[in-house]
């Protein structure tokens, strides 16, 4: 335990918390343009073709973003909205594209968890 005199001479240093989503600049979402849309394979125990896109954001950052849901309509030059949230089995993918916003359509025929995939309530 430091004495009061020691603390007067050299105060305690606050620990700096490093952001897990630096490209967002403390914003909830950011807009960007797809520069490349492709599939990639996950880490060891899993096997799939995960849909991802490279996005150039409005603040100049270029990030890799995951496209959730079954099927998508994204191609090069599509304008997308990016939110934080990493994909555990894809190294370097720290962002998600927001479905149903800007050029990214919602998931077709989605009935459950619709709000996460940009789907309106179906007519009864």
Swiss-Prot record:
Molecular function, one GO term: rRNA binding
Any matching Pfam family: Ribosom_S12_S23
GO BP term, pick one: translation
Tagged with keyword rRNA-binding: yes
PROSITE patterns in alphabetical order: RIBOSOMAL_S12
Keyword annotations from UniProtKB, A to Z: Methylation, Ribonucleoprotein, Ribosomal protein, RNA-binding, rRNA-binding, tRNA-binding
Recorded superkingdom: Bacteria
3-methylthioaspartic acid modification, residue list: 89
A GO term from the CC aspect: small ribosomal subunit
UniProt KW tRNA-binding keyword: yes
Function: With S4 and S5 plays an important role in translational accuracy. Interacts with and stabilizes bases of the 16S rRNA that are involved in tRNA selection in the A site and with the mRNA backbone. Located at the interface of the 30S and 50S subunits, it traverses the body of the 30S subunit contacting proteins on the other side and probably holding the rRNA structure together. The combined cluster of proteins S8, S12 and S17 appears to hold together the shoulder and platform of the 30S subunit.
Record note on quaternary structure: Part of the 30S ribosomal subunit. Contacts proteins S8 and S17. May interact with IF1 in the 30S initiation complex.
NCBIfam families in the record: rpsL_bact
Family: Belongs to the universal ribosomal protein uS12 family.
PANTHER family attached to this UniProt entry: 30S RIBOSOMAL PROTEIN S12 FAMILY MEMBER
Name used for this protein in its record: Small ribosomal subunit protein uS12
Protein's organism: Tolumonas auensis (strain DSM 9187 / NBRC 110442 / TA 4)
Gene that encodes it: rpsL
């Amino acid at each position: 335990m430091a004495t009061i005199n020691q603390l007067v001479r050299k105060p305690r240093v606050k620990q700096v918390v490093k952001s897990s989503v630096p490209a967002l600049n403390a914003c909830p979402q950011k807009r960007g343009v797809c520069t490349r849309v492709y599939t990639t394979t996950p880490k060891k125990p899993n096997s799939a073709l995960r849909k991802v896109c490279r996005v150039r954001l409005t603040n100049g950052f270029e990030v890799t973003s995951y496209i959730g849901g079954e099927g998508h309509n994204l191609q090069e030059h599509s304008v997308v909205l990016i939110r934080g949230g990493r994909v555990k089995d894809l190294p370097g993918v720290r962002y998600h594209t927001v479905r149903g916003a800007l050029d990214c359509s919602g998931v077709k025929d989605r009935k459950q968890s619709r709000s996460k995939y940009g789907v309106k309530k179906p007519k009864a």
